[in-house]
């Protein structure tokens, strides 16, 4: 409604000012919200890595031939998705329960092992023997299910003859590289908190079970490394607020644990005098042998997926087969 100013002139400003100010506030609020959203969506690069260049000395199998074994050997691989893709022939994803005939990221390990004279068998999702492959699960699995593991043909189906597996390969998934702390030993057989100390406890518990089966070679494959990708700021903030696992901090802890597994002098097998246990360091291989504490072969559009890509799986196959050929001779399974 028109009003008179102090000079008696008609003024329209008073009646319009509240509406104009409200509109400006709304527009300003929307702009601020859009700006804040854009900032939170900005990618945040992880800080530079602080790498420990100290190298451990793994077990040396060079005294043994890496040629194919002189007799057929049965091999069981207990795995989930990464192991299934590693075994698979390259091609479209074709399989179920992570037992693939072909896979986009296939590493061709099954074909390579078969060509070297191994009979390859698998247990994965959808089976009692293939379930529960986290680090703390292994002691209970081998303690309670060892006979079934050794007789496993595929999933929970045993061999129809009286034979057993000569080799048992077991591997946890990359989630078991997401360590939360170093921590002190818990004394509870590993527990469910993934610390370096608890993981060491779990693997120490395996050795008495393996010692009871000197005729079987047990191959521990280290878990693949975590992908260290760029993530939006809002995810980084949310993880901090929710106290979720810190991927950056987990890398050095995963390196510490896997170095311990493979260190022949001071590690897991330093005091184990039998020859029926070996460690294949897939973690180190997929970090380009210590060039990072994280995966150098990730998948996903931005490298955010920790499943190894085809190049990483093929590289692992090229290293694993001669390693296994030497390990079976060291274990006395063939000449």
Describe the predicted segments one by one.
Residues 93-102, 177-198, 232-249, 298-302:
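A solvent-exposed, charged loop/short amphipathic helix patch at secondary-structure junctions
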């Amino acid at each position: 409604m028109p009003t008179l100013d102090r000079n008696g002139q008609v003024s329209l400003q008073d009646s319009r000012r509240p509406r104009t100010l409200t509109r400006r506030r709304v527009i300003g609020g929307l702009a601020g919200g859009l700006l804040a959203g854009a900032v939170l969506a900005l990618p945040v690069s992880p800080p530079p890595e602080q790498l420990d260049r100290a190298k451990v000395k793994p077990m040396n199998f060079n005294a043994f031939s890496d040629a194919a074994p002189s007799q057929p050997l049965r091999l069981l691989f207990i795995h989930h998705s990464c192991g299934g893709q590693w075994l698979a022939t390259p091609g479209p994803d074709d399989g179920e329960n992570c037992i693939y005939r072909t896979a986009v990221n296939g590493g061709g390990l099954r074909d390579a092992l078969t060509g070297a004279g191994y009979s390859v068998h698998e247990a994965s999702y959808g089976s009692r023997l293939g379930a529960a492959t986290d680090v703390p699960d292994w002691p209970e699995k081998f303690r309670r299910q060892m006979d079934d593991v050794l007789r496993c043909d595929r999933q929970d189906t045993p061999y129809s003859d009286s034979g057993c597996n000569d080799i048992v390969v077991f591997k946890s998934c990359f989630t078991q590289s997401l360590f939360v702390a170093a921590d002190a030993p818990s004394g509870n057989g590993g527990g469910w908190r993934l610390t370096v100390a608890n993981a060491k406890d779990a693997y120490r518990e395996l050795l008495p079970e393996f010692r009871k089966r000197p005729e079987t070679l047990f191959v521990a494959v280290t878990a693949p490394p975590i992908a260290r990708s760029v993530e939006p700021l809002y995810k980084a903030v949310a993880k901090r607020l929710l106290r979720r696992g810190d991927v950056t901090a987990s890398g050095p802890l995963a390196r510490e644990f896997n170095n311990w597994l493979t260190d022949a002098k001071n590690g897991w097998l330093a005091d184990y005098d039998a020859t029926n246990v070996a460690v294949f360091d897939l973690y180190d291989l997929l970090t380009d042998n210590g060039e990072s504490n994280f995966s150098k072969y990730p998948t996903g559009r931005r490298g955010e997926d920790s499943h190894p890509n085809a190049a990483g799986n093929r590289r692992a196959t090229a290293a694993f087969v001669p390693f296994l050929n030497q390990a079976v001779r060291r274990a006395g399974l063939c000449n």
